[in-house]
């Protein structure tokens, strides 16, 4: 019997059903899903922040209706057509399925990170953002109005900037990683400075992960080629050996309530498994190949611990525009979804009902929480056919085995205007939006050319990168890069 052909990860037939796609007119730099409501917030390269509310039930129904209609008309799967079978909207929109709750010019320059308050007593009530302007702001999620803010320039060294935010799940600690490898800690109540951990990494901090089961003061960070375990009061607890590959993101798995097992994504297209109880996180224990042609830029736990398969899984987004579900117990990719052929996956989140949210600089997709009935039917059919063929071929002893497949919110009044942060009446930064946006676009255009050569040397190339569609806007010149380096100069 012939050996099954091994499929390339990039040629796997994508699975899953998107129910919503939001297309952005300016590069998306950060996105976050609300932990308890159907809301997501987007931070853009221009410094704007948008808050949208969606009706997931209507989106699911509309997607299913389109699929059923296509199947009724042509007796074929909707996935065989070139048309989208999900809802597509612009970033500012008001429909029955999705509305823009508020929008504002929150920062001068890019908005680099957005984050909802995860503390149980105030979960989702507050939104934290940080921009290129070195200002951290805390706002009311419902209205968008700023409650407090702080300029952290005094805490940064020359030519340093914040890349990533992280919040303790139990204490008012807001952590920020910087381009120079430091971690700054603020009191999230009033944004006063509390701690500073210097030289955690030699280069930018790519990701920060809280360790609530260990201590509210303990966190993991990745940056450059190392993983560090830090105590925000005392400094570095341990730092891993040099992995000789850039570490970009990480996640605990849902079935580990001790924060012991952590999965780490690499620039070389792999995911590695680490255990604190084995070797104090000094080195990886094993690795899982995901996509050798791309970098694994972002990772998040599947979170749904009610399902054994999902409880052992993480989602990984890569620079080829693919999203892979990796089961660490099986040591392999068990599902692959296509976010976009011309948009790298730089952001992942899980909404309040365990729906996957994927995003790149151009668009965001929200995926159905329901299983893919078509794929299950097709899979059963293929298995049946293969079984019959196998029986027939076994009699002849010469057959070859066929290749296997390894809530709706009300439309609130718009709060955008010509002034920065017009949504909040207390903010005194009054610059015209048109002037600020024009400056942002010039900065983006100028920096993109400067960074292009640098990125070419460090990033694995997508097979379709040279044929990416050209957009008729200034921001189309912005080059993509893996990890936190997409922020270079912005």
Curated annotation (Swiss-Prot):
Q: Name one GO cellular component term.
A: nucleolus
Acidic residues bias locations: 370-406, 413-437
What are the protein's UniProt keywords? Nucleus, Repeat, WD repeat
Q: Where is this chain compositionally biased, Polar residues type?
A: 450-461
Which cell locations does it reside in? Nucleus, Nucleolus
Residue spans with biased composition (Basic and acidic residues)?
A: 438-448
Q: Which GO terms describe its biological process?
A: positive regulation of transcription by RNA polymerase I; ribosomal large subunit biogenesis; rRNA processing
- UniProt lists compositionally biased (Basic residues) regions at 469-484
Q: What is its main location?
A: nucleus
In terms of Gene3D superfamilies, this protein maps to: YVTN repeat-like/Quinoprotein amine dehydrogenase (2.130.10.10)
Alphabetical list of InterPro entries matching this protein: WD40/YVTN_repeat-like_dom_sf, WD40_repeat_dom_sf, WD40_rpt
Specify where the region named Disordered lies, as residue ranges: 368-490
Question: WD repeats span which residues?
Answer: 23-64, 70-112, 118-155, 157-196, 242-284, 286-327, 340-377
Tell me which family the UniProt entry assigns to this protein.
Belongs to the WD repeat WDR55 family.
The identity of this protein, by name, is WD repeat-containing protein JIP5
- What organism does the UniProt record list as the source? Meyerozyma guilliermondii (strain ATCC 6260 / CBS 566 / DSM 6381 / JCM 1539 / NBRC 10279 / NRRL Y-324)
